[in-house]
């Protein structure tokens, strides 16, 4: 994914201001920032949910503005709140998404995802019968069913228990190792530090820091010992406010 001068305005309010970055295959980028920084707006623009006011977004070389259908086929966006169909079972959700993306021979993949996300015994259950964590797992399983090349997560661990958190982290890492480009936004900086190789920090819609975790930590430490990503984040955002 390549993003160049991404800008999103709501009337006179500039929510995202000339944001540029890239995410290579196999890379996990952490998008972080204070509340109201423009993270969710950025993710929704990248996914084509809210078209940008200006700038270019290329998904695997495909311009999102010029060919939105082809570009969106290559990605999956998992928002912070599961959006499910009230009258579709767990299994039917996966079938619906697979058919929507014209996924060939998806049945084996469907069964594998149900097992991976511990939903096998819930395949005939409706959303009203699922816990918050199970709904989160189902939403992400639906995002994985068509094997997208770009994965966009907004707070992927919400509602998960400790075992679910561990397995979700393993699932994200596995997709990156298989060649997916991953963008992950979270307020859990220890999660970002654990999973991501690159971090983009935004504030008031602008990029204020961008680089590998080690580069950002070194920038703050300046040879005076190691610092955590949390400490680096707090210092960088304080300087940018």
Task: Show where each model-derived region lies.
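Conserved ABC transporter NBD signature motif
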Residues: 55-66, 70-71
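Conserved ABC ATPase signature
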Residues: 126-133
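Catalytic Walker B motif of ABC-type/P-loop ATPase nucleotide-binding domains
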Residues: 151-155
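Helical segment within the ABC ATPase nucleotide-binding domain
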Residues: 165-178
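ABC ATPase "signature
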Residues: 210-211
